[in-house]
Amino acid sequence: MPLNALALWLLPALQFKQFVLAYETDGLHTKPVAYMAWAQLSAQAESRYVNNAALGLTLKDWQSGERFWITDFCAPYEHASDFAQALATTLPEFCFRSLYHRGAERGMRVHYFRGKHVTPEQAKRWWRDRPILAHNRTELKDEVV
């Protein structure tokens, strides 16, 4: 990530406390092993984000609505599954979406996540009631994770 991207993606997440950072300790040393950030987007901000995520979000966008999008997820392979499960416990009442990070290779995709207190039926209803209004929506493939 270029240094100027920090202002678009890292600093707003820190400013609004919309991130989770996981640590691992061996008794002597503590090291970060996983990070996730999210934005709470309005339908309009979501549409702009899905149409061109590379443009980033404005500060106002980060807390503009109730559509939760994972903007950054970083976890080494050995920690990714455990971290995803921990997030479902840490954020148990929420439904999240994320753009697939290899969209250029496999096509644009949206992944869906839910907290552990959200049933699959509740999650489907949540997402159905908040459809993605992006212009290139027809090019997206949905994957429930």
Language model regions located:
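Short amphipathic alpha-helix that is part of the acyltransferase structural core
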Residues: 1-7, 133-145
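Residue-level detector of conserved, well-ordered beta-strand and adjacent loop positions
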Residues: 23, 39, 71
